[in-house]
Amino acid sequence: MLDWYISVSFGELTLKGKNRHTFEKRAISKILDAISDYKIEEYYQEQGKLYIKADVNDFDEIIDHIKKVFGIVYISPCVKCEKTVESMQDGVLKIIEGKIIKDKLQTFKVDVHRVDKRFEPKSPELNPLLGGTILKKYGNYVKVDIKNPDFFIYVDIKDNCYVYTDRIKGWGGLPIGSSGRGLLLLSGGIDSPVAAFLMAKRGVRVDCLHFHSYPFTSQRGFEKVKQLAEEVSYYTGNINFYSVNLLPVYKAITKNCKERMMTIISRRFMMRIAERIANENKIDALITGESLGQVASQTIQGVSVINEVTSLPILRPLIASDKTEIIEIAREIGTYETSILPFEDCCTVFTPKRPVTKPRIYDVKREEENLDIEALVQECIDNMELIKIRQ
């Protein structure tokens, strides 16, 4: 009897040695959460893959949800066969039916992977045998090409036998939560949502912190950033969205510090506030969308001065990326169109005409002596808002 399943192949999880079981268990949990709205008849693991049985009519939607789970290399609709040559022959005929395009000659190659080495005949004998079965029935539409075929027909012989042809690419990476927690400084721009996506791909559970300067920034600008957080949560899962009004800090800097120091000093305040929130919520690291040289504060000297105010690691996944590369990812994950909506954020509203690009820590600290740092940080945190974004 032939049954349709979805097979899920894990990526780096297979390299995790003794921790592999823990990583796979976490990934499977995320997959089942992602497809919980669908009727799943059964699921099980077999030698490095997860197999899911569901209604074939739901396959496209189920696969679309599974693709968004990090830790997966590819997904394949497959036919489960009995471990006999006859059943495999039926399996390859069933799987190729959907690949044949009438009136267009296509080429294929059979690729047998015999995990169970006790099974006979061996792969070099099975490949032409199964290929011959296909040619006998569909020789008018397909032919064999072992060097450059239009598609492969894969046959995995394990405890059971599975036949498939499509390998639908997943995002790879590691399952969410397997690499700790991070607090993303989320602006309204293109970069920070991409940074969130990339860190989530590495297994980091991401929460978001947004700084605004209402009423100098608009409510519509805030709603834009909240929408970005919701779009990011499609990949990261549930997000705690912290909103902080940084206006008291900007006013104090404007009154007491040199204008050209505005950007670097305000960034240091952002890191101080972010560190407080992270420590109070057991978050392991801070995340930014900074890219080296992209704006005035994103120089090596600027990054060094910003780092000085926190003992937490600051993860910068975009630090060596070109803007075109960042935009490409933003388009792919669906955040680009929201990011380019024309609303200003606090960084653009209070940008000095000639910001310092190579700040020295001594000069910055001397300017900060004119500020009551702890009082300003506390004032911002006291007025913080928290929005829980849930999938």
From Swiss-Prot:
Signal sequence, renumbered to the chain: none
Entry annotated with the keyword RNA-binding: yes
Domain THUMP residues, every copy: 60-167
Gene3D superfamilies named in the record: 3.30.2130.30, HUPs
UniProt KW RNA-binding keyword: yes
Keywords: ATP-binding, Cytoplasm, Nucleotide-binding, RNA-binding, Thiamine biosynthesis, Transferase, tRNA-binding
Superkingdom to which the source organism belongs: Bacteria
HAMAP family: ThiI
Protein name: Probable tRNA sulfurtransferase
Source organism (scientific name): Finegoldia magna (strain ATCC 29328 / DSM 20472 / WAL 2508) (Peptostreptococcus magnus)
